[in-house]
């Protein structure tokens, strides 16, 4: 890590304040000045460039190299994964598979508390893992409204449910991005993934209970307690095992599929004595044959299979130095700098999703390759601005890391000493509330967390996991999430009402994560 100086003023408090200007500016642009995300990110990138060069004395060539590295990593693998994941989802919708898939879930039980577990929790988590970026909140909220839920109630429930899966959205990008940051102590995404098995399970286990309590109070919990226990236990345990032994990429997809499957089997033998129907009305789903249901789920079976193959050590060995596929990696040093930029064409998770998408199209009669290419073009256009924003934010993070700004901030927050682990999730909460993204939050704050961890002697991976967990709790109230949810259920203009509904649960979960992180810091 190239750092000329992290204390140019020979006064840590002043140096840290100047180092914090890029983060403060980005947050002010997004909240006070109401600038578009891309405009705020580009302005902040420009200001960071001047601060890193003029104040922290990062050489011009290294500054340019930092930005180039950030932009390339924002495009590949991050942007690549986003585009491929959303494209696969669009293919499933256009081919009619998604409608059958949706019906297969609704048809499991007429009890709408059970439907909330299946759609609001399990399917929400599945879509978060497969697509992310607001897709699960929008789709699941609309589905619940179609079943008779009140619009704002449906939006609130989906936002809260997303707290169990937001850490691993879009094939695990929020944690996977750790590998692109070059963190203090060589912290990797796998290190953080394993640590989330300690920070997240209690939240994951609690959320299904909270959802049913919000819908039907303690009476609802008592009446469908067996179903809640199946949902909470299977999802929590399976996600913990996957984050420990496989990694972040499938940490939403496999647990949600497994939970839906086992809950469906359980409900064949058990149903609540009293069928709970909102307003006394249920929503009947169209019957589909088992063959059609299996076909409908096929894009996501393929996705799971290919991503799992890509995560195997044997496959990664093919891409390592001396491996048969080593040629597929491309790297270069940015001219005028010492900073290396690399692109892994085959090993990127996006390539696994690409294969799932192409296989789906070639084996489905309802959609042709030409139509799927048109969908891909539209996805690229629709997500070009968000991806550009991610590129700019990674560029900011790289400048701050190479320029010493991150080290200055880390040294400053480390002055809180052993109390810092309690504050760690709060940093993450602030990051997601302001940027609307766990990806951007980890990009900005993970370097600060690891630097502080190294200074105070706390496991840096624990602090990054806490940063992630705290950030996920902010998704319940971040303006971006609220806007998506209200728009999806036709309640645009009622953002304040929805925020008021979710705010206390966001704060409550954040306090729990902070206390739990502090306890864990005493043990690890």
Curated annotation (Swiss-Prot):
Nucleotide-binding keyword on record: no
Entry GO MF terms: lactate transmembrane transporter activity; solute:proton symporter activity
Family the entry assigns: Belongs to the lactate permease family.
Keyword Nucleotide-binding appears in the UniProt entry: no
Function text: May play a role in L-lactate transport.
Domain of life, source organism: Bacteria
Sorted UniProt keywords: Cell membrane, Membrane, Transmembrane, Transmembrane helix, Transport
Species assigned in the record: Halalkalibacterium halodurans (strain ATCC BAA-125 / DSM 18197 / FERM 7344 / JCM 9153 / C-125)
Primary location: membrane
Membrane-spanning segments: 12-34, 38-60, 67-89, 127-149, 156-178, 193-215, 224-246, 250-267, 297-319, 339-361, 374-396, 411-433, 505-522
Localization, UniProt: Cell membrane
Name this polypeptide is given: L-lactate permease
Membrane topology, from the record: Multi-pass membrane protein
Gene behind the chain: lctP
Pfam families: Lactate_perm
InterPro entries in the record: Lactate_perm
GO CC terms: plasma membrane
């Amino acid at each position: 890590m190239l750092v000329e100086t992290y204390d140019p003023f020979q006064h840590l408090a002043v140096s840290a304040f100047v180092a914090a200007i890029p983060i403060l500016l980005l947050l002010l642009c997004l909240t006070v000045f109401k600038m578009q995300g891309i405009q705020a990110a580009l302005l902040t990138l420009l200001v960071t460039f001047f601060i890193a060069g003029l104040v922290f004395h990062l050489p011009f060539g290294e500054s340019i190299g930092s930005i180039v590295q950030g932009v390339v990593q924002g495009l590949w693998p991050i942007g690549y994964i986003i585009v491929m994941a959303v494209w696969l989802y669009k293919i499933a919708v256009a081919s009619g598979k998604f409608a059958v898939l949706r019906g297969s879930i609704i048809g499991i039980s007429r009890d709408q508390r059970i439907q909330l577990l299946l759609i609001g929790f399990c399917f929400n988590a599945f879509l978060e893992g497969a697509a992310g970026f607001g897709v699960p909140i929008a789709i699941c909220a609309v589905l619940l409204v179609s079943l008779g839920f009140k619009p704002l109630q449906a939006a609130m429930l989906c936002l809260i449910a997303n707290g169990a899966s937001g850490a691993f959205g879009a094939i695990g990008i929020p944690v996977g991005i750790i590998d692109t940051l070059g963190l203090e102590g060589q912290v990797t995404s796998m290190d953080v993934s394993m640590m989330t098995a300690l920070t997240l399970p209690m939240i994951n286990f609690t959320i299904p209970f909270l959802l049913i309590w919000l819908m039907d109070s303690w009476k609802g919990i008592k009446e469908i307690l067996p179903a809640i226990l199946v949902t909470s236990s299977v999802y929590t345990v399976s996600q913990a095992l996957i984050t420990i032994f496989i990694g972040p990429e499938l940490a939403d997809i496999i647990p949600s599929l497994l939970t839906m499957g086992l809950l469906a089997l359980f409900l064949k033998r058990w149903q609540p004595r009293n069928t709970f129907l909102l307003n006394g009305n249920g929503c009947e789903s169209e019957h589909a044959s088992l063959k059609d249901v299996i076909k409908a789920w096929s894009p996501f079976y393929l996705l799971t299979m290919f991503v799992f193959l890509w995560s195997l050590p044997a496959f990664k060995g093919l891409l390592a130095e001396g491996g048969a596929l080593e040629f597929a990696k491309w790297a270069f040093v940015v001219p005028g700098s010492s900073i290396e930029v690399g692109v892994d064409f085959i090993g990127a998770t996006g390539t696994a999703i690409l294969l799932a998408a192409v296989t789906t199209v070639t084996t489905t009669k309802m959609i042709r390759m030409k139509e799927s290419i048109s969908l891909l073009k539209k996805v690229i256009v629709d997500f070009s601005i968000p991806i550009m924003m991610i590129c700019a934010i990674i560029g900011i993070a790289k400048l701050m890391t190479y320029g010493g700004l991150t080290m200055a901030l880390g040294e400053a927050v480390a002055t809180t000493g052993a109390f810092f682990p309690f504050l760690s999730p709060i940093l993450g909460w602030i990051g997601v509330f302001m940027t609307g993204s766990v990806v951007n939050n980890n990009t900005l704050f993970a370097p600060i967390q690891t630097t502080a961890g190294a200074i105070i002697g706390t496991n840096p991976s624990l602090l990054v996991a806490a940063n992630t967990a705290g950030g996920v709790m902010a998704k319940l109230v971040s303006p971006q999430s609220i806007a998506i949810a209200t728009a999806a259920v036709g309640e645009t203009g009622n953002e304040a009402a929805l925020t008021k509904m979710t705010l206390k649960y966001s704060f409550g979960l954040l306090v729990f994560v902070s206390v739990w992180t502090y306890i864990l810091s005493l043990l690890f």
